[in-house]
C-alpha cells in the first residue's frame, strides 16, 4: 500500500444492492492504484478477498450495537493505522474529527425529510435517529 495519501473508507453498512456495487468498485480502483484502508461489513469478505493491495477491517451488522454505539470500531482502527488524510463514510454519520478531511456521503435522503411520507413506525423511528446523527455529524465534515 502506498502511504503518500492515506484513505480510510467506511462502507460497513453496504453489503447489498447499489451500495455493494459502489464498495466493490472503490475497492477495485484503490487496489489497482495506491491502496487504501477499508471498513467493510463482514458479509462481503469473500467478494473482496482477491484485492490484496488494500487493508480491510471487517465489522458485523449488529443493529443494537449501532443504535447505542455507532462507530464503536473506529477508535481501535485509528489507533492501529494513525490519523488518515481522508475519511470517506458512505451513509454512516461522522461522529468526531477522524481525518484531516472527513467526507460524508448521504446514501439515503429519506432520512432528512420523512414528513408526509407513509412509513411504518419502526422505519420512521430509525429515520429520525439517523437524521439526528447526520445533523450532529455535519460539523465534522
What are these regions (language model features)?
Residues 2-8:
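Extreme N-terminal starter segment of soluble prokaryotic enzymes
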Residues 8, 23, 29, 33-93:
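Active-site donor-binding segments of glycosyltransferases and PAPS-dependent sulfotransferases
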Residues 9-24:
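A short, glycine/small-residue-rich beta-strand->loop->alpha-helix junction that serves as a flexible
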Residues 14-16, 63-68, 120-127:
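Short, flexible loop segments at the rims of nucleotide/cofactor-binding pockets, characterized by
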Residues 16-18, 45-48, 94-98, 111-114:
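Short catalytic/ligand-binding loop motif for oxyanion handling, primarily in non-cytosolic enzymes
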Residues 30-31, 95-99, 138-139:
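Short, conserved loop/helix-junction motifs that constitute active-site signature segments
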Residues 76, 123-141:
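Membrane-proximal helix-turn-helix segments that form the acceptor-binding/catalytic region
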Residues 86-88, 98-118:
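Active-site proximal beta-strand in glycosyltransferases
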Amino acid at each position: 500500500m502506498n502511504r503518500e495519501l492515506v484513505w480510510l473508507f467506511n462502507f460497513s453498512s453496504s453489503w447489498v444492492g447499489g451500495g455493494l456495487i459502489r464498495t466493490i468498485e472503490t475497492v477495485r480502483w484503490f487496489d489497482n492504484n495506491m491502496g487504501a484502508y477499508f471498513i467493510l461489513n463482514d458479509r462481503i469478505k469473500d467478494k473482496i478477498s482477491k484485492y490484496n493491495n488494500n487493508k480491510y477491517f471487517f465489522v458485523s451488522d449488529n443493529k443494537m450495537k449501532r443504535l447505542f454505539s455507532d462507530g464503536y470500531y473506529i477508535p481501535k482502527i485509528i489507533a492501529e493505522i494513525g490519523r488518515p488524510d481522508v475519511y470517506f463514510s458512505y451513509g454512516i454519520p461522522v461522529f468526531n474529527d477522524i481525518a484531516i478531511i472527513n467526507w460524508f456521503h448521504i446514501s439515503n435522503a429519506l432520512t432528512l425529510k420523512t414528513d408526509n411520507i407513509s412509513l411504518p413506525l419502526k422505519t420512521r423511528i430509525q429515520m429520525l435517529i439517523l437524521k439526528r446523527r447526520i445533523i450532529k455529524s455535519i460539523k465534522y465534515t
